[in-house]
């Protein structure tokens, strides 16, 4: 599955090893979500920093924020790229969140259907 959909809009929720700090997923420390982004800017940042522990751009339990304008409204202290900068970097929003799939009982359960269809 990863060979086909990574990098891309697919988040996999997998069993967390003992090495994963429980604070990374306080609601269910037995799992961890992993994603490899497709966009060149994100991959450039990851190439320089290594693995990043992040959250999605929405409040827990609420719909995903799909535009920079929605992010700025919900999180006014967050800096986002201006429209001209997004255009210069080739950032195009699909309008869909990532698909989230959890490995459980020897099969994938779709927790959120998004841009990737499994």
Kindly give the residue locations of the regions a language model identified.
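Active-site-adjacent structural elements in enzyme catalytic cores
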Residues: 1-118
């Amino acid at each position: 599955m990863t060979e086909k959909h990574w990098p891309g809009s697919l988040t996999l929720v997998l069993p967390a090893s003992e090495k994963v700090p429980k604070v990374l997923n306080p609601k269910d420390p037995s799992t961890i979500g992993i994603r490899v982004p497709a966009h060149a800017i994100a991959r450039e940042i990851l190439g320089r920093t290594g693995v990043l522990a992040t959250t999605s751009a929405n409040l827990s339990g609420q719909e995903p924020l799909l535009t920079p304008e929605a992010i700025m409204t919900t999180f006014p202290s967050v800096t986002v790229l201006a429209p001209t900068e997004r255009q210069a970097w080739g950032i195009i929003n699909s309008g869909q969140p990532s698909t989230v799939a959890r490995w459980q009982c020897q099969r994938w359960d779709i927790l959120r259907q998004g841009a990737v269809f499994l």
